[in-house]
Amino acid sequence: MQRKDFEEILDFAIAREREAIKFYQNLQNQAQFQDQKEMLKELEAMEQNHITIIEKLHQTGVKDEDIHKTPNLKISEYLTADPETLDLSYQNILIKGMKREETSFLLYSEMSVKFPDPEISTLFRHLAADEAQHKKYFENLYDDWMRKGN
């Protein structure tokens, strides 16, 4: 793999994270309750941290052993609501987040098999694993919320 290709993929991933930050900032502006705004700020910070991690990959590269396995609770796969049409209840914020992270996970997973270059494939699998962690974060919040009888 050419170094330029690696850098372009990382830049693409950073741009997607910046889109996610804007997404959460936009939701903060729409949120009606302070606790919702605080949660959205935490999510924004999580995405900012992901940018930092991706930027470090510019220097360190990525190896197979860097890819962590994240169990898939599959909650978002069973939710059929269009996240764009949902209001900003706590439940719907979680659904929007789950669906966004699921989309990113699927994109990076698909890209990992489309490129024959092992280094590019490993990079996309690493990015997919990070998105899977974010998705699981939302699914855990959603699961906890549902268990409380909501």
State where each predicted segment sits.
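Non-heme di-metal
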Residues: 1-150
